[in-house]
């Protein structure tokens, strides 16, 4: 039987601002990537999200991003490899403390937004991020875009790597995600998104916006928690994957 991890970016509320339906979405995912205060989240939200995920039996990972609350960490910012290393170590440490306080441990690390996309193409940045994860805890799993520089850097570093695919994003022929600045970046039709995921998991293929099929590895599927239809989509995709005889299981 085919199996795949379903991960979601959570804990992205902060202060008086509520983003997403974290508690409900946790019913449908196997792994949670929790924001660590730079692109979103705050200490109280981090603590509450950790507790909710533990109560649901969901694996927990750090979701470090660029220090850009206004841009939600989705705007590219020029940073050095050293700065990338420092901000990843810092944010892993912050979430690790909350997990330790709850008597638990972290399972993985997945960079957020622009940091994730920059590292997917930039060897120097990707190596710094992989090194940061390895130096904090070599047993952590690194989540990276399938086949990207980040995933390859993690493997070279000796980390276990989960090659990630996206349910609601379109792909370019080089395996990267279509920029959110483009009108065709998002897949808003649930049925099309489900079809894309099932094919990626079962066949290791995805159809690009250029009209070509490319190969990729699908260890984990990302669903975004900040969209207005996120909860309904989480319900739909988990139900349809099970109907397609695909087992939902946290990455190990």
From Swiss-Prot:
Q: Which domain of life is it from?
A: Bacteria
Q: Name one GO molecular function term.
A: 5-oxoprolinase (ATP-hydrolyzing) activity
Instruction: Name the EC number(s).
Output: 3.5.2.9
Q: Which UniProt keywords apply?
A: ATP-binding, Hydrolase, Nucleotide-binding
User: Which SUPFAM superfamilies does this chain map to?
Assistant: Glycoside hydrolase/deacetylase
BP terms from Gene Ontology: carbohydrate metabolic process
Q: Name one Pfam family in it.
A: LamB_YcsF
Catalyzed reactions: 5-oxo-L-proline + ATP + 2 H2O = L-glutamate + ADP + phosphate + H(+)
Q: What class of enzyme is it?
A: hydrolase
Q: Which InterPro entries match?
A: Glyco_hydro/deAcase_b/a-brl (IPR011330), LamB/YcsF/PxpA-like (IPR005501)
The record's similarity note reads: Belongs to the LamB/PxpA family.
User: What quaternary structure, including any partners, is listed in this protein's UniProt entry?
Assistant: Forms a complex composed of PxpA, PxpB and PxpC.
Q: What does this protein do?
A: Catalyzes the cleavage of 5-oxoproline to form L-glutamate coupled to the hydrolysis of ATP to ADP and inorganic phosphate.
* PANTHER family found in the cross-reference section: 5-OXOPROLINASE SUBUNIT A (PTHR30292:SF0), UNCHARACTERIZED PROTEIN YBGL-RELATED (PTHR30292)
- What is this protein identified as? 5-oxoprolinase subunit A
């Amino acid at each position: 039987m085919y199996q795949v991890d379903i991960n979601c970016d959570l804990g992205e509320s902060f202060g008086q601002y509520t983003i997403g339906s974290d508690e409900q979405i946790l019913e449908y995912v196997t792994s949670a990537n929790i924001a660590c205060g730079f692109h979103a989240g705050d200490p109280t939200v981090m603590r509450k999200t950790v507790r909710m995920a533990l109560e649901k039996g969901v694996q927990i990972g750090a979701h470090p991003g660029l220090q850009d609350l206004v841009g939600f960490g989705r705007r590219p910012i020029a940073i050095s490899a050293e700065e990338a290393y420092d901000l990843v170590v810092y944010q892993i440490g912050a979430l690790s403390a909350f997990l330790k306080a709850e008597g638990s441990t972290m399972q993985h690390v997945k960079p957020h937004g622009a940091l994730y996309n920059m590292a997917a193409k930039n060897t120097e940045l990707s190596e710094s991020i992989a090194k940061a994860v390895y130096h904090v805890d070599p047993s952590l799993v690194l989540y990276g875009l399938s086949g990207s520089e980040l995933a390859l850097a993690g493997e070279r570093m000796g980390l276990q790597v989960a090659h990630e695919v996206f349910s609601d994003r379109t792909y370019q022929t080089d395996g990267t995600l279509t920029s959110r600045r483009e009108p065709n970046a998002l897949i808003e039709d649930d049925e099309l998104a489900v079809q894309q995921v099932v094919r990626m998991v079962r066949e290791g293929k995805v159809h690009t916006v250029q009209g070509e099929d490319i190969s990729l590895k699908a260890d984990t599927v990302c669903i975004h928690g900040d969209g207005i239809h996120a909860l309904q989509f989480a319900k739909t995709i988990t139900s349809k994957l099970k109907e397609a005889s695909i087992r939902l299981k946290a990455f190990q």
